[in-house]
Amino acid sequence: MNTIISKRFFSENVAELVIDAPLIAKSRKAGHFVIVRVDKHGERMPLTIADADVEKGTITLVVQRIGVSSNKLCALEAGDELADLVGPLGKATDIKKFGTVVCACGGVGAAPMLPIAKALKEAGNRVITVLAARNADLIILKEQLEAVSDEVMVMTDDGSMGQKGLVTTGVEQVIAREQVDKCITIGPAIMMKFVALTTKKYNVPTEASLNTIMVDGTGMCGACRVTVNGKTKFVCVDGPEFDAHAVDFDEMLSRLRQYKNEEVESMSLGGQEFSSLGVTSEQVQSTLNSKASKPSVTPLVPPFAGTAKDRVAIPRVKMNELKPEERIQSLYAEVNQGLTFEQAVTEAHRCLNCKKPTCVEGCPVNINIPGFIKQLEIGNILGAAQIIGESSTLPAVCGRVCPQEKQCEAQCIHLKMGKEAVAIGYLERFVADNAELKVESQSSKVGKKVAVVGSGPAGLAFAGDMAKYGYDVTVFEALHEIGGVLKYGIPEFRLPNRIVDKEIEGLRALGVTFQKDVIVGKTLSIEDLQAEGYQAVFVASGAGLPRFMGIPGENLNAVMSCNEYLTRVNLMNAASE
């Protein structure tokens, strides 16, 4: 999968890649795009699908070498594999019989225009393609466009091929001689802006296919937003095609320029990865572990000999934290360092083992909280883990990020006595971090397949529960990392990726399988899953699009949604540059 089948250059800086991607080839339509990631350090780069061969299971992409990522992609050869390829994305082009349609494209915009022109022609339209570039060397796909158009008009800035002039000159010539019912434009943003201004003078409905900055490309971060008719729209899910007369091109152009200096600097360094200011979370954790005294798992300890009053008198444990002077050295060092064995046992002594434990009622998954704490109190960490594992699939995650103060701990009897609640979250984390527990299925295999859409906390928890009941579970994830919001939405100083990965490996041990770069509803449909034998589908697609307030300035450069900021830092490693 994702193997480059063939590669050729149209010009010095424009390459065509044919890639093995059978699922995308099968589901792709004119106007769709994909997100490409060259390697584990690469950006997520949007590229419109220029062509697809369903029988061969391939898609065709045309790439112009502009920045670091596009240079990396163009440097690959046939036989190389892309780290990630996800799609099809965006809305397909609205194809129907309009009448006469002008397809105005510039530069590499000819590639995404090709399937659109072909589909329009097949729908019975008269298709006139205006193909523009600076010079003859940059004109691409002319013969292919001629095969699907009634007429191809070539425009070059220097007159080296076709007519001398801009794309707008050709568009106006067509409008002047005959009725034009629709115009579609694809190319550089500045070109599309002036095509829109030209067609607006003649009241010709015009669609522009926008290519904005993207981070995830699946509708989660909001980096691709544009203003259309005064409202914020997202290119990756609402587009990429919009009413060109309603697009705020000036704002879009400004947003496209915001990382120009950084890109130039990266190119001047030959695309080297910046590492002088950051280290990996694994390196940080390794350093911290070498400094800290890890809690030892000792044999069973004698039971607490005091009274209930003595238990209540024990003060709540304070979490050990990384020192500020160490904390400021990296975004990835976990601040809360966990409890020592002695601290955990002492805190467990505070539990009164209530006959009617309201803390269990406050827990969303009804963990037997007094039960696991009593095991921990006598030093039986494995026994405590087994009790937690009966109800919770992700104890190391939940012990860190669950809002215990609003759930289980909020129901603790200590609060009614004017004391601080038992630190249930701290204890759950301690058990999860220190017990090497192999979770096993509670049932024999039932021979039924279940699909889970999304690998965030809901998807992972559901997958674990179904696997325990004997179902064959597959989790489909749109991004290139398993974990969803646990990976991209929570900073590593609070929830390290290694903890999430450990929980995921536990699910794999249960038999759960994972497929990345698959968008259910795009790459695969529910009907496709049913045809493959899945008898149930659990949709855990996450929070979705960010919400903007519609106030002046929120689309200015360097204004980000929290989703975009966290995704850039957590998923794309932006903090290392």
Where are these regions (language model features)?
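Ferredoxin-type iron-sulfur electron-transfer modules and their immediate structural context
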Residues: P240, D248-V284, L288-Q442, K449, ...
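Rossmann-like dinucleotide/flavin-binding elements
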Residues: M113, A119, K356, V452-F476, ...
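FNR/FR-type flavoprotein reductase catalytic core
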Residues: V68-V215
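Glycine-rich FAD pyrophosphate-binding loop
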Residues: Y471-K487
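N-terminal Rossmann-like dinucleotide/flavin-binding domain of flavoprotein oxidoreductases
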Residues: A385-P395, L427, L486-Y534
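A short, basic/flexible loop-to-alpha-helix module at the beginning of a structural domain
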Residues: V86-K97, A432-V450, T567-E577
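Ferredoxin-reductase
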Residues: M1-D80
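Residue-level detector of alpha-helix initiation sites
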Residues: G107-A110, A189-I190, M220, T393, ...
